[in-house]
Amino acid sequence: MKPRFDIIRASRWFFLLSGAITVAGVIVFALFGFNLSTDFKSGSEVQFELNQRVPEARVRQMFASIGLPLGDTSLTVGGIQQNVVMVTLPEQLTAKQISEIQAAEHRFFPDAKQDIQVNSVDPFVAEQTARKAVYAVLAAAACIVVYIAIRFEFRFAISGIIALLHDAFIVLAAFALLRREVDLTFVAALLTIVGYSINDTIVIFDRIRENLKIDKPETVDELRAVVNKSLWQVMNRSIRTVLTVLIAAVILYFFGGISIRNFTFALIIGLVSGAYSSIFIASPIWVAWRSRSMKKATRGDKAAPIPE
């Protein structure tokens, strides 16, 4: 039965959509940049838990009273009861400042559940962490290229990497636009997204390869038909998989605590983007590339002299 919607024939619209998102992302980066956590820049994180829903205005007043005014993105509230406070400060706190914060906490919130927890990172450690995070992502991408090139072919590998870059860019743009904090859990989420997306893409590529062996397309139209059929054959599997993982990620986002909120938020965006790119970006790119090779081969055959 012929599929109701020809994904490959409509691929130019998906490319335009992704292109528009990419342009919007570049604009967001240029205007806002990233809200880096102390993992990637020097500074301090202060965390404590109250026995009530966090009154943000009073927390800001508490820090202002000791000469540490908070910016718009410096205060994060989490916890199931919204009673956990995490404050990011650009400077490394001294022992005196930490004592002043503890005294201010007892003064403003005498019934607080726990004492102040402070985590400080110096510039050298932050720089090293940022560099290692970039290396981790690049190493993962390189290993993926090699694996797909060996198992399938080089065109499949490049198409898959383009889809992965698309997913990573979508997540990065969302964090820049929403001013979400980029920390080490974000890097972990990015690597998780890469793993999920490439797994989904490999399943699709494997189905395409099997159908190519069976149908043996000789023209571009036949190639497009085979790939389109393959995409619809794995569509239900892809949708069920992403929905299953999404449900778990959403539950973690709301009930998993403040420490993994950035991880789960990035995961939610990346899962949706990964499911989209595996079907609507990676495979159409491969088809466009393979079609060009087939057309060149056809023109070469026509131009070849007829043997006497």
From Swiss-Prot:
Superkingdom of the organism of origin: Bacteria
Pfam families listed in its UniProt record: SecD_SecF_C
GO terms under cellular component: plasma membrane
GO BP of this protein: intracellular protein transmembrane transport; protein targeting; protein transport by the Sec complex
Transmembrane residue ranges: 14-34, 134-154, 158-178, 185-205, 238-258, 267-287
Parts forming coiled coils: none
Keywords per UniProt: Cell membrane, Membrane, Protein transport, Translocation, Transmembrane, Transmembrane helix, Transport
Main location: membrane
Localization in the cell: Cell membrane
InterPro entries (UniProt xref): SecD/SecF_arch_bac, SecD/SecF_bac, SecD_SecF_C, SecD_SecF_C_bact, SecF_bac
MF-aspect GO terms: protein-transporting ATPase activity
Membrane topology according to the record: Multi-pass membrane protein
Functional note: Part of the Sec protein translocase complex. Interacts with the SecYEG preprotein conducting channel. SecDF uses the proton motive force (PMF) to complete protein translocation after the ATP-dependent function of SecA.
Assembly and interaction partners: Forms a complex with SecD. Part of the essential Sec protein translocation apparatus which comprises SecA, SecYEG and auxiliary proteins SecDF. Other proteins may also be involved.
Family to which this protein belongs: Belongs to the SecD/SecF family. SecF subfamily.
PANTHER family found in the cross-reference section: PROTEIN TRANSLOCASE SUBUNIT SECF (PTHR30081:SF8), PROTEIN-EXPORT MEMBRANE PROTEIN SEC (PTHR30081)
Annotated protein name in UniProt: Protein translocase subunit SecF
Source organism of the structure: Alicyclobacillus acidocaldarius subsp. acidocaldarius (strain ATCC 27009 / DSM 446 / BCRC 14685 / JCM 5260 / KCTC 1825 / NBRC 15652 / NCIMB 11725 / NRRL B-14509 / 104-IA)
Higher taxonomy: Bacteria, Bacillati, Bacillota, Bacilli, Bacillales
Underlying gene: secF
